[in-house]
């Protein structure tokens, strides 16, 4: 019997996969426990529509990430901050990923989730710093942050 897997099953099949399995196994275990459904023509058509919608959503999200990457890596996109600093160019306080995201949105209108910034620790010195951002699977950008001394 041909079945369409609804959930991933280790060693048997992945979600959305169509496989031929013994009738008893399909009816008594897979279908009964909600792991699969029978591969009728209507179920196969539904599966194709769902897979196409998922692929379109993936492509749209990737295109949006590419667009944000272009904006972030533009030469004019530099997030500026003013902060008090000591004599050795060390800041009193620090610039966290949350502040960087807020500054980016305020100065350029670009929204990025702060969890996507790969900043191991907050910035604690004056000058330019490059902050890598993982926007999407395979799409990475760099935000340039410039911190100047406050008068």
UniProtKB/Swiss-Prot annotation:
Belongs to the bacterial ribosomal protein bL9 family. It comes from the Bacteria. The keyword rRNA-binding applies. HAMAP family: Ribosomal_bL9 (MF_00503). Keywords: Ribonucleoprotein, Ribosomal protein, RNA-binding, rRNA-binding. This is Large ribosomal subunit protein bL9. GO terms for molecular function: rRNA binding; structural constituent of ribosome. It comes from Lactobacillus johnsonii (strain CNCM I-12250 / La1 / NCC 533). InterPro entries: Ribosomal_bL9, Ribosomal_bL9/RNase_H1_N, Ribosomal_bL9_bac/chp, Ribosomal_bL9_C, Ribosomal_bL9_C_sf, Ribosomal_bL9_N, Ribosomal_bL9_N_sf. Binds to the 23S rRNA. One of its GO terms (cellular component) is ribosome. One of its GO terms (biological process) is translation. The keyword Ribosomal protein applies.
């Amino acid at each position: 019997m041909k079945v369409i897997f609804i959930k991933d099953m280790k060693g048997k099949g992945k979600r959305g996969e169509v496989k031929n399995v013994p009738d008893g196994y399909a009816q008594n275990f897979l279908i009964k426990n909600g792991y699969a459904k029978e591969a009728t023509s209507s179920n196969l058509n539904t599966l194709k529509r769902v897979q196409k919608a998922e692929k379109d959503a993936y492509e749209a999200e990737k295109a949006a990430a590419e667009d944000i990457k272009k904006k972030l890596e533009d030469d004019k996109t530099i997030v500026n901050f003013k902060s008090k600093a000591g004599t050795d160019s060390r800041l009193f306080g620090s610039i966290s990923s949350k502040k960087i995201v807020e500054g980016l949105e305020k100065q350029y209108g670009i929204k990025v989730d702060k969890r996507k910034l790969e900043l191991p620790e907050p910035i604690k010195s004056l000058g330019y710093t490059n902050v890598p951002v993982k926007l999407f699977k395979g799409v990475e950008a760099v935000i340039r942050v410039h911190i100047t001394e406050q008068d």
